[in-house]
Curated annotation (Swiss-Prot):
Keywords: Ribonucleoprotein, Ribosomal protein, RNA-binding, rRNA-binding. The keyword RNA-binding applies. Part of the 50S ribosomal subunit. One of the primary rRNA binding proteins, this protein initially binds near the 5'-end of the 23S rRNA. It is important during the early stages of 50S assembly. It makes multiple contacts with different domains of the 23S rRNA in the assembled 50S subunit and ribosome. Forms part of the polypeptide exit tunnel. InterPro entries: Ribosomal_uL4 (IPR002136), Ribosomal_uL4-like (IPR013005), Ribosomal_uL4_dom_sf (IPR023574). GO terms for biological process: translation. It comes from the Bacteria. This is Large ribosomal subunit protein uL4.
Length: 211
């Protein structure tokens, strides 16, 4: 079980929160998280690259030159892979890069990744609810009040990010905001600091706390 400090919008301590999630054994945690990240990255690949083989390239019905008498190596098609404009040998074709992983393993990897970042995590009460219109400066100043370095990558996890928050954050290259239902291993590990809304924390504990 880990104890976390709950901050208000001004960066002052507003209470305490606990996070107790089942994690993988130390001997298997690295391998489990690695497989989860590889799977997530593989699923983001489109797999639409496609080349033409010698049977698909336009042309190729005629013989480039006669079989004998030229002194050159014999060739039977102008679309052989040995000629410019010919087909591609073993080129890429549309395919799926998806990798399988058991649901229990995926959930365990996510819980393990989250608990591994517990020292870089802060809980914020009513994150951004005071904003009435999108203001990037307000988000930057708030992160500074929370003690986050200016050059740090920040992942903000909210129960349901409002349009105001999304528009306030989207112009900050180092900051990313996601919903609690979009929690994933790569983003958890890629960020230097995690900012979790109090309601999002409740959602995470409700969804992942029963395993």
């Amino acid at each position: 079980m880990a104890n976390c400090v709950v901050l208000d919008w001004q960066g002052q301590e507003a209470g305490k929160a606990t996070l107790d999630l089942k994690v993988a054994k130390e001997t298997t945690a690295v391998d489990l998280i690695h497989r989860a990240v590889v799977r997530q990255q593989a699923h983001s690949r489109q797999g639409t690259a496609s080349t033409l083989t010698r049977s698909e390239v336009r042309g190729g019905g005629r013989k480039p030159y006669k079989q004998k008498g030229t002194g050159r190596a014999r060739q039977g098609s102008i679309r052989t892979p040995l000629r410019p404009g010919g087909g591609i040998i073993f080129g890429p074709k549309p395919r799926s890069f998806s990798l399988g992983m058991n649901r229990k393993e995926r959930r365990l990897a996510l819980r393990t990744a989250l608990m591994a970042r517990i020292n870089d995590l802060m809980i914020v009460q009513d994150f951004g609810t005071a904003l009435k219109v999108p203001k990037t400066r307000e988000i930057v100043e708030a992160l500074s009040r929370f003690g986050i370095a200016d050059d740090a990558k920040v992942l903000i996890i909210l129960a349901q990010p409002s349009e105001i928050i999304i528009r306030s954050v989207r112009n900050i290259e180092r900051v990313k905001v996601i919903g609690a239902d979009q929690l994933n291993v790569f983003d958890l590990l890629n960020a230097n600091s995690l900012v979790i809304g109090e309601k999002a924390l409740s959602t995470i504990k409700e969804v992942y706390g029963d395993d």
